[in-house]
Design a protein with these regions (language model features):
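Carbohydrate-binding surfaces of carbohydrate-active enzymes
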Residues: 4-260
Length: 262
């Protein structure tokens, strides 16, 4: 979030089905939402998959309609620029199997026709709008400090911070409710609901900001393991939920760990 302030726009590479697996639709939308949330502005997709992709072996070939679907998904989530990668498959090198709109022969094909259709549709649509920016009334606090801490101390086998964020995002995605990702320090008053999954580490400014939001009538949902560490990644000696105990109005005396093999 802080780094994005130094740039005119942020971007990411969107590969949905390639050598290393397939991404679920909600995962792609979540990642789009995260990029949009960094600056609260439209973002770019610098590389949008346009063919079968892989290094040592080919990934799945996008079936008819998927390039169009993925492009519209990007735009609907706030992208104002989508760049297909690549134009034509390279005949040599590490990514010689990384197909683009055109195959190695450079001849127009099914994917070329599909991208041409999308281009014509976008040209027509652009007459009425520049970019779509979903107006989110729900926010999820994304804490890189908590994510990095949890990557070292897993807490529970099979628990991953990134997957947990997706679990909180998915129900809103299923209902068509836009979600922003925020820091604990930024303005929360525009949101009706703020979720704080596994917010283990929070700055004094962030803690105060969340308290102010809640005291003004905002709704905050904490998950397990929230408020348990300081900003130096040290465990606190206060009873769980630590720095949020007063705001939550509870103390956790004991807990049970549920794992996939329990």
């Amino acid at each position: 979030f802080k780094l994005s302030k130094e740039f005119d726009f942020v971007t990411w590479d969107n590969y949905i089905e390639f050598q290393w697996g397939k991404a679920k639709p909600e995962t792609v939308s979540r990642d789009h939402a995260l990029l949009r949330s960094y600056k609260k502005k439209p973002f770019w997709v610098m590389e949008q998959q346009s063919g079968p992709c892989g290094w040592s072996k080919l990934g799945p070939t996008p079936t008819p309609g998927k390039l169009r679907l993925w492009t519209y998904q990007s735009v609907a989530n706030g992208a104002d620029t989508v760049v297909y990668f690549r134009w034509r498959a390279c005949p040599f090198g590490t990514e010689e199997l990384w197909h683009g709109i055109l195959n190695h022969d450079g001849k127009p094909n099914r994917r070329y026709a599909e991208v041409s259709r999308v281009g014509a549709e976008m040209e027509e649509l652009s007459k009425n709008y520049r970019a779509l920016m979903p107006r989110a009334r729900v926010a999820i606090i994304k804490s890189f400090d908590s994510e990095w801490s949890q990557s070292i101390h897993r807490q529970v086998e099979g628990l991953y911070y990134d997957s947990l964020l997706l679990d909180y995002y998915r129900p809103f995605w299923n209902m068509g409710i836009p979600v922003d990702f925020v820091t604990a320090e930024e303005d929360l008053n525009r949101y009706d609901l703020v979720l704080a999954p596994m917010l283990m580490m929070v700055s004094d400014e962030g803690k105060k900001n969340i308290e102010t939001y809640a005291q003004a009538g905002g709704k905050v949902l904490f998950s397990f393991r929230s408020g348990i560490k300081d900003m130096y990644n040290n465990m606190l000696t206060e009873t769980v939920p630590g720095v949020f105990a007063d705001l939550a109005g509870v103390e956790v005396e004991d807990c049970l760990l549920y794992t996939s093999d329990a």
